[in-house]
């Protein structure tokens, strides 16, 4: 499965939980949250656009860093 890396403006565990919640709701994803570096690496068949839209539901500033 393709891997995508995103920058997400997470400042605490609650932010990471919000990211985890929206990704689990989307389904079909495996992900790793790097809170200190404010990055989320997602392995999924979903397009980067769908993943970006999903992460935007957290209300945090999100940007696509590219394939990993």
Curated annotation (Swiss-Prot):
<dbReference type="GO" id="GO:0032767">
    <property type="term" value="F:copper-dependent protein binding"/>
</dbReference>
<keyword id="KW-0406">Ion transport</keyword>
<dbReference type="GO" id="GO:0043066">
    <property type="term" value="P:negative regulation of apoptotic process"/>
</dbReference>
<dbReference type="InterPro" id="IPR006121">
    <property type="entry name" value="HMA_dom"/>
</dbReference>
<dbReference type="GO" id="GO:0005507">
    <property type="term" value="F:copper ion binding"/>
</dbReference>
<dbReference type="GO" id="GO:1903136">
    <property type="term" value="F:cuprous ion binding"/>
</dbReference>
<dbReference type="InterPro" id="IPR036163">
    <property type="entry name" value="HMA_dom_sf"/>
</dbReference>
<protein>
    <recommendedName>
        <fullName>Copper transport protein ATOX1</fullName>
    </recommendedName>
</protein>
<feature type="modified residue" description="N6-acetyllysine">
    <location>
        <position position="60"/>
    </location>
</feature>
<keyword id="KW-0479">Metal-binding</keyword>
<feature type="binding site">
    <location>
        <position position="12"/>
    </location>
    <ligand>
        <name>Cu cation</name>
    </ligand>
</feature>
<keyword id="KW-0186">Copper</keyword>
<keyword id="KW-0143">Chaperone</keyword>
<keyword id="KW-0597">Phosphoprotein</keyword>
<dbReference type="GO" id="GO:0006878">
    <property type="term" value="P:intracellular copper ion homeostasis"/>
</dbReference>
<dbReference type="InterPro" id="IPR017969">
    <property type="entry name" value="Heavy-metal-associated_CS"/>
</dbReference>
<dbReference type="GO" id="GO:0060003">
    <property type="term" value="P:copper ion export"/>
</dbReference>
<feature type="modified residue" description="Phosphoserine">
    <location>
        <position position="47"/>
    </location>
</feature>
<keyword id="KW-0007">Acetylation</keyword>
<comment type="function">
    <text>Binds and deliver cytosolic copper to the copper ATPase proteins. May be important in cellular antioxidant defense.</text>
</comment>
<comment type="similarity">
    <text>Belongs to the ATX1 family.</text>
</comment>
<comment type="subunit">
    <text>Homodimer. Interacts with ATP7B. Interacts with ATP7A. Interacts (via dimer form) with SLC31A1 (via C-terminal domain); this interaction improves ATOX1 stability and controls intracellular Cu(I) levels.</text>
</comment>
<dbReference type="Pfam" id="PF00403">
    <property type="entry name" value="HMA"/>
</dbReference>
<dbReference type="GO" id="GO:0016531">
    <property type="term" value="F:copper chaperone activity"/>
</dbReference>
<feature type="binding site">
    <location>
        <position position="15"/>
    </location>
    <ligand>
        <name>Cu cation</name>
    </ligand>
</feature>
<dbReference type="GO" id="GO:0051117">
    <property type="term" value="F:ATPase binding"/>
</dbReference>
<dbReference type="GO" id="GO:0006825">
    <property type="term" value="P:copper ion transport"/>
</dbReference>
<keyword id="KW-0813">Transport</keyword>
<dbReference type="GO" id="GO:0006979">
    <property type="term" value="P:response to oxidative stress"/>
</dbReference>
<feature type="domain" description="HMA">
    <location>
        <begin position="1"/>
        <end position="63"/>
    </location>
</feature>
<dbReference type="GO" id="GO:0005829">
    <property type="term" value="C:cytosol"/>
</dbReference>
<dbReference type="InterPro" id="IPR051881">
    <property type="entry name" value="Copper_transport_ATOX1-like"/>
</dbReference>
<keyword id="KW-0187">Copper transport</keyword>
């Amino acid at each position: 499965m393709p891997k995508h890396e995103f920058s997400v403006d997470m400042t605490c565990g609650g932010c990471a939980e919000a990211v985890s919640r929206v990704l689990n709701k989307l389904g079909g994803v495996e992900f790793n949250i790097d809170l200190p570096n404010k990055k989320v690496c997602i392995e999924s068949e979903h397009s980067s656009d769908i993943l970006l839209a999903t992460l935007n539901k957290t209300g945090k500033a999100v940007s696509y860093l590219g394939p990993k």
